[in-house]
Amino acid sequence: MLGRLYLVVTPRPGWSLEATLDRTERALAGGVEVVQLRAKDWEARPTLALGERMLALARRYGVPFFLNDRPDLAALLGADGVHLGQNDLTPEEARRFFAGMVGRSTHAPEQALRALEEGVDYLSVGPVWETPTKPGRPAAGLAYVRWAAENLGEKPWYAIGGIDLGNLDQVLEAGARRIVVVRAILDAPDPERAARALRERLYGVA
């Protein structure tokens, strides 16, 4: 069962590998329940090097580790899952390389319904608000979150995009029970405290 609080670690320009790992570990200590490495512009070797270290952290805290976009590298690492965007390989193609869990980004109801047909293990729904993590992508808004809550049944899904402690209640009121965050934890002055606050709010609803 996938937990409610999912962190995507996108290494920041100027951060050392150790700084990235330190902030990841502090987030895990605060209660992050799923962690993903998203290093879109990195070549394979540095992605594997950081991925190995992050996977070890995830194992230490007992949470699943996902790699973004690269089922081949996910298989080499022994990752728990791979997360695919709309312009990445299809889940069927990814499973030729990789036997673990497969997640899928969706930005509209028709994409979500297709992801269900593709048999993904979970999907993300958003972006709820515009975010610099995905520049140029228009917000899908809370209406898409409400649609997901009404139509996706028992399939695990995560609201994503610009979510932080200040607007989390709106996302919960729209029906989400799982969220993906990047900046709200990764860029926080204290990632452990930020993760703990988000998790407490998430688990404060039924």
From Swiss-Prot:
It comes from Thermus thermophilus (strain ATCC 27634 / DSM 579 / HB8). GO terms for biological process: thiamine biosynthetic process; thiamine diphosphate biosynthetic process. Belongs to the thiamine-phosphate synthase family. It comes from the Bacteria. It is an enzyme of class 2 (transferase). 2-[(2R,5Z)-2-carboxy-4-methylthiazol-5(2H)-ylidene]ethyl phosphate binds at residues 131-133, 162. Condenses 4-methyl-5-(beta-hydroxyethyl)thiazole monophosphate (THZ-P) and 2-methyl-4-amino-5-hydroxymethyl pyrimidine pyrophosphate (HMP-PP) to form thiamine monophosphate (TMP). Its cofactor is Mg(2+). The keyword Metal-binding applies. The keyword rRNA-binding does not apply. HAMAP family: TMP_synthase. One of its GO terms (cellular component) is cytoplasm. Keywords: Magnesium, Metal-binding, Thiamine biosynthesis, Transferase. Its EC number is 2.5.1.3. This is Thiamine-phosphate synthase. NCBIfam families: thiE (TIGR00693). Mg(2+) binds at residues 69, 88. Pathway: Cofactor biosynthesis; thiamine diphosphate biosynthesis; thiamine phosphate from 4-amino-2-methyl-5-diphosphomethylpyrimidine and 4-methyl-5-(2-phosphoethyl)-thiazole: step 1/1. GO terms for molecular function: magnesium ion binding; thiamine-phosphate diphosphorylase activity. Binds 1 Mg(2+) ion per subunit. 4-amino-2-methyl-5-(diphosphooxymethyl)pyrimidine binds at residues 36-40, 68, 105, 134. SUPFAM superfamilies: Thiamin phosphate synthase. Pfam families: TMP-TENI.
